[in-house]
């Protein structure tokens, strides 16, 4: 009489461990190639399979492996109030942000990624959502509430509330590739204060470190009031702010993630110091800091900072005219750039409920 052998629970666990070890022994480049061939939803499931899989998916090598000659553009879409003026608060109607990816090589290749429900507030018209994209993640700030999300997988984390009693909180987001760290920089302003009042209560939260918000030394930070969006390049966050006596000057601020140093980097020259500066004016153009200035609604000057020498200079790199688009859209803004040097445009106001438009423009100027 034959008897069927039964595997013990220990033996089953040992076999599963062996299978897992086989995957762990694969070369990193092969693991990355395997994950790259999977749908995004499958990649998201692997985040919870093992620490090894999660480490590979979150590694800079895996993130940068998606950089191709035809990269995708990340699009964040949401219905907002007060969208007719660039300096009015952008307040979400239903507290939802939808993320899409789009390829510049095909107008029909836009695909839905995920949707994020943001926190509500009893004072919705007094606060603005601040969104910043850095190295695969998006930081969304709304008053004291801060969220960091991965739009590709839909996963997100809610940070501890910013340490302040004020309702008006401005935020910036940065990534340091040297230490592989993400940080959120926040500062507060008085809700009904004057435009001459500087920001205060500057504090930093480091992702992945179980520590509270870190308050920066106020005595080391010059008086300033943020005026534009922020751009992170090589572990440094830049943004334009009002500085000087009565906040009458415009300067470029520099926040270094490595040592949490926040200071004035350089003053803006007269040619750039213009009322036409708006919230999305800073760009990362081919790895260099750039400023896009609308001469009119359809003519733009792009200035690029030259940091190669000891003297930092702003060079007028490109001037281009997109007036042929005037018949289709009332007002267009530069919203970003691609890794291949294309400029990304979008209408300031989208009057169609079920469609939105994004344009890629490749300048032929040197």
UniProtKB/Swiss-Prot annotation:
Residue ranges of the region described as Disordered: 1-20
Domain F-box: 20-66
Regions of compositional bias (Basic and acidic residues) in chain numbering: 8-20
UniProt-listed InterPro entries: F-box-assoc_dom_typ3, F-box-assoc_interact_dom, F-box-like_dom_sf, F-box_dom
Protein name stated in the entry: Putative F-box protein At1g26515
Lineage: Eukaryota, Viridiplantae, Streptophyta, Embryophyta, Tracheophyta
